[in-house]
From Swiss-Prot:
It comes from Lactobacillus helveticus (strain DPC 4571). GO terms for biological process: rRNA processing. It holds the Pfam family YbeY. Its cofactor is Zn(2+). The keyword Nuclease applies. GO terms for cellular component: cytoplasm. Transmembrane segments: none annotated. It is found in: Cytoplasm. The gene is ybeY. Single strand-specific metallo-endoribonuclease involved in late-stage 70S ribosome quality control and in maturation of the 3' terminus of the 16S rRNA. One of its GO terms (molecular function) is zinc ion binding. Binds 1 zinc ion. It comes from the Bacteria. Keywords: Cytoplasm, Endonuclease, Hydrolase, Metal-binding, Nuclease, Ribosome biogenesis, rRNA processing, Zinc. This is Endoribonuclease YbeY.
Length: 174
């Protein structure tokens, strides 16, 4: 499978944890999700770890939500303005930039306690959820939600972080 080139920006020191290689685990999640949605080209994206103030600021400015959130995604292709990438199909060095994620570890930790999922499960859910948004998936309509949360569930299960029966509707907590 072709790789995903991830650029990290860590404003909160999340990746400094010497007891865990977060980047390897994130890559495992991303590659499983990429395989699950049938993407076979080279991808690039960024993941930005931010504090609650920054998450709140971004969420208010771009989503009109007056609170911090776990993840905000900014997809390069959003809506009907899709870019025709077929001109690059014969270029093995071309990387499709899918966008940027802004993740807030402290909100993810709080959600893991609220939903009773544990940090690893909630973090994995959030990474995959954001990645799917960058690739055009959404959960506004029930049929879209079923597809998106189904993909999340399969990826998490492959990582040993299965969804519980009462979480299948949203792919998340209780």
């Amino acid at each position: 499978m072709d790789p995903i080139d991830v650029t990290y920006h860590d404003e909160v020191g999340f990746l400094d944890d010497k007891n865990r290689n977060w980047q390897d685990w994130i890559m495992k999640l991303l590659l499983l999700a990429k395989k699950e949605i049938g993407k076979d080209n080279n991808l690039e994206m960024s993941i930005n770890f931010v504090d609650e103030d920054r998450s709140h600021e971004i969420n208010l400015k771009y989503r009109d939500k007056d609170r911090p959130t776990d993840v905000i995604s900014f997809a390069i292709e959003d809506g009907e303005d899709a870019i025709d990438l077929s001109v690059f199909e014969d270029d093995p060095d071309f990387q499709e930039d899918i966008g940027d994620l802004f993740m807030c570890p402290s909100v993810i930790k709080r959600h893991s306690k609220e939903y009773g999922t544990g940090f690893d499960r909630e973090f994995g859910y959030t990474v995959v959820h954001g990645f799917l948004h960058l690739n055009g998936y959404d959960h506004i309509k029930p049929d879209e939600a079923k597809e998106m949360f189904g993909i999340q569930g399969k990826v998490l299960e492959e990582c040993g972080l299965p969804l519980y029966p009462d979480q299948l509707d949203e792919g998340r907590g209780k």
